[in-house]
Amino acid sequence: MVYRTPIAWMFALSAMGCKKVDEAPKEYESALAYMFEHFDDEDPERLVETVEFLDEWLVGADLEAAEEGLSIQNLPQSAVGGLAGHAHKTDGLEGVSLATSSRYPTCMLMEALTQYSFARMMPDVYITYDREFDSGQDCIATRDCLWAEGSVYSVADWGVLGEVTADRRIEYRWIETAEGWAFLQRWWLTEESTGTRLGLSIGDQYYIGINFPDGDGTRRIHGSWLTMEMVTGDASTGASKQLIKNWKKDAEDLDAWISANL
């Protein structure tokens, strides 16, 4: 982890906010918002259709753009109104998305993400990662069940921004597509996340992950919307751009961990 002085860190967030990130096409950002809002639909047909659309869309120049990172428009309030936790809002959210790839199949990614602690997989980031499943942990990796959900309490090391605590609800779901089994991830903050320095607070954050077969490996799509404040004011734009950098590193770290441990 790279440590910066507070002034340098605030400048970096400001610079990231100024750096242009291409806007996602409407059909792409609408697909991500749909997947988040309808994640728990009983009938998976439209979810499957949306995954297959994204699979077909992510080729050529569109794939290259998504692998660099795209800005996405806000979630509708209807997507968050029924979520557990505090009174969720979508006002002022900044959204970004990134496409990454893994050389491992979806079943191995699901195993890593649900059966092992992120504090073990990413020890340079997580000081604490306490996860408790309400259902599905013992069967989701083998697809003996198609749904798992639970809660996470984490403390992350953000360098000069201090230790950042977060409480999340997490959900995982398998769906079967024409190309094979895909899995979806959804999480959101159940209360404001806070840091120990520079007045950092994340009022709301929502995440959608879409993972589907790509040859012998997996194509992964990440999308997130958040609001963040610091002593300098609204830091949402800079924070959302930092997510792109983080996701790229996390994807590499996850593959490296799987290679060494599974």
Regions found by a protein language model. Give the residues of each.
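Eukaryotic helix-grip
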Residues: 21-262
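Bacterial N-terminal signal peptides that target proteins for export
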Residues: 1-7
